[in-house]
Amino acid sequence: MWFKNLQLHHLPAPWAVTPDQMEKWLAPHAFQPGSSVEMQRVGWASPRDDGALVYSINRQMLLLFRAEKKLLPASVVNQVTKARALEVEEQQGFKVGRKQLRELKEQVTDELLPRAFSIRRDTRVWIDTANGWLVIDAAAQALADDVRSLLVKSIDPLPLAGVHVARSPVAAMTDWLLSGEAPGGFTVDQDAELRSSDQGGATVRYVGHALEANDMRRHIETGKQCTRLAMTWNDRISFVLTPSLTIKRVTPLDVIKEAADPTAQNDDERFDSDFTLMTGELGRMLTDLVDILGGDRHDSIHQAAA
């Protein structure tokens, strides 16, 4: 249930969108299996396998982005194309040109696609309409871009904005690493990455290792800055913070696992309980994280204008 990665975006808070309205927006872009000659197909699928494209409880929505892609290695295409080009050269008596080779490659791709295996990847999207968060559970930026692209295509207009904090995450992480502590109920854990801003980009990584203050100071004095830092929020959730404010390796700790509703009678009730618990905890953590990074600049601009 728990998201492993958090790609953060802002929506208006509150965002007056109902589950029914969201369902209508997504329906024209529902996932359909690709044809035998399509390399990739994307669309919205049911998060609960019940036909509904939107799962919603307590103003929290869950969407599911599905991508189907054919597995056709470039090495296979190139190998078959090369063999086909040799045959053509023997027939026509001269070397295949660039344009002809490109056409052969396209022909080979079309022939091999129907026999290629397909893989599906599902990516979850959490929308907090009460507090104005849209969060994509994706580690890779390219995947998050694909999800955002379909969101924009499905919801017009989509009032989506990035999260721009007042303080640079790199500067903040470097200071926390140097002092060995972070503010606001956050603690520094034992994983960190320090990278030099020089052209060479020398990098030092610590994994499961005590982050000694003297070692950190020595690296920072030579021009390195912290670009990844493992942290824990209120002894409840551990995660890794990155320069882009993407949050990775999100893990609920024992105190949250023990808070799961023991009275849930079936899978639906357990899902409701788990999703409510996850969104509540992550929502509070995100608010605290933005606060210790100086607040959201977008909110500050609006307050100043008012």
Swiss-Prot record:
One of its GO terms (biological process) is DNA recombination. GO terms for cellular component: bacterial nucleoid; cytoplasm. Its main location: cytoplasm. GO terms for molecular function: double-stranded DNA binding. Keywords: Cytoplasm, DNA recombination. Pfam families: RdgC (PF04381). It is found in: Cytoplasm, Nucleoid. Belongs to the RdgC family. HAMAP family: RdgC. May be involved in recombination. This is Recombination-associated protein RdgC. It comes from Burkholderia ambifaria (strain MC40-6).
